[in-house]
Regions:
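Membrane-interfacial loop-to-transmembrane alpha-helix junctions, especially the N-terminal start
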Residues: 1, 71-76, 183-189, 241-245
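Membrane-embedded, hydrophobic transmembrane alpha-helices
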Residues: 1-70
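Membrane-interfacial segments
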Residues: 10, 14, 39-44, 180-185, ...
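Active-site lumenal/periplasmic loops and adjacent helix-entry segments of GT-C-fold
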Residues: 81-218
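Transmembrane helical bundles and short interhelical boundary loops of multi-pass, membrane-embedded
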Residues: 95, 245-246
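Transmembrane-helix signature of membrane-embedded glycosylation machinery that interfaces
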Residues: 6, 173-182, 224-227, 231
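Internal/C-terminal transmembrane anchor helices
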Residues: 64-89
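Membrane-interface transmembrane helices that cradle and orient dolichyl/undecaprenyl
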Residues: 220-245
Length: 246
């Protein structure tokens, strides 16, 4: 979203060749920042003080067979949940056929507008859909799909995005439940139940394909899990003194 606002201001066209390198560097930077944060946390600072690096970061203890089985079962139920969510599309729908609803038609035209205009800003990037008026409209989904679509493949890219959003949905639900409870039954059942819910994904991604709204919805469980873990860690560091270190 930040890039969609910055690029028009800097007169940089929104296309894969200009956006993907920035996203790639951001990913690498995030990984490096996480690694430094982890090292700072387990080592009590950045100074080695004569301690070997391997000892400073701690030796990773291999997980046992029981834990490995639980992880495998969890990912197995995530796969089942995804297949349940995606089966109507995979078994019936042709990826080359546009969804016969008014909302998907609007959003596919939005992707076309970005491909032609090279402007993905929420502050007017879809102006061609509003008679040239630069109105505010959230363009996160449109901007992302435009990176993978060509002028003749917007329909296919949009339909594939439904499958990607379904995967994010069931993974996020599993992540959220894993930080809320230690119940293995709940953890294994959640992705399967989540894949069969009527509102999401059946209605939002199969019946009406409300892609931008669905994008916001599927991100909620995973982001909630991240904030819960971060909040617990911050609370623990404050409780035991020393303040929040990372």
């Amino acid at each position: 979203t930040v890039l969609t606002v910055l690029y028009p201001a800097l007169e940089i066209p929104w296309e894969a060749s200009t956006v993907m390198p920035v996203l790639g560097m951001s990913t690498v930077g995030g990984a490096v920042a996480w690694g430094l944060s982890y090292f700072h946390r387990v080592n009590g600072g950045f100074a080695l003080n004569g301690v070997p690096f391997r000892e400073a970061i701690g030796v990773r203890v291999p997980i046992g067979g029981r834990q490995a089985a639980i992880r495998a079962a969890t990912w197995g139920t995530i796969l089942v949940g995804f297949l349940l969510a995606a089966w109507p599309l995979l078994s019936v729908a042709d990826p080359a056929n546009p969804v016969q609803q008014w909302d998907p038609t609007f959003h596919q035209n939005g992707v076309h507008a970005i491909l032609y205009g090279k402007d993905a800003s929420p502050f007017g990037g879809l102006h061609e859909l509003y008679g040239g008026r630069r109105v505010y409209y959230p363009t996160g989904w449109h901007a992302f799909v435009a990176l993978f679509a060509r002028y003749d493949s917007v329909v296919q890219a949009s339909n594939v995005s439904s499958l990607a959003l379904m995967a994010v949905w069931v993974i996020g639900l599993a992540a959220l439940v894993s930080v809320l409870t230690g119940s293995r039954t709940a953890l294994l059942a959640t992705p399967i139940i989540g894949g069969m819910l009527h509102n999401m994904p059946a209605d939002a991604l199969t019946m009406y394909n409300q892609w931008p709204n669905s994008t916001g919805t599927v991100l909620v469980p995973g982001l909630a899990a991240v904030f819960i873990v971060a909040g617990r860690r911050a609370a623990a560091e404050l409780r035991f003194g020393g303040g929040i270190r990372s």
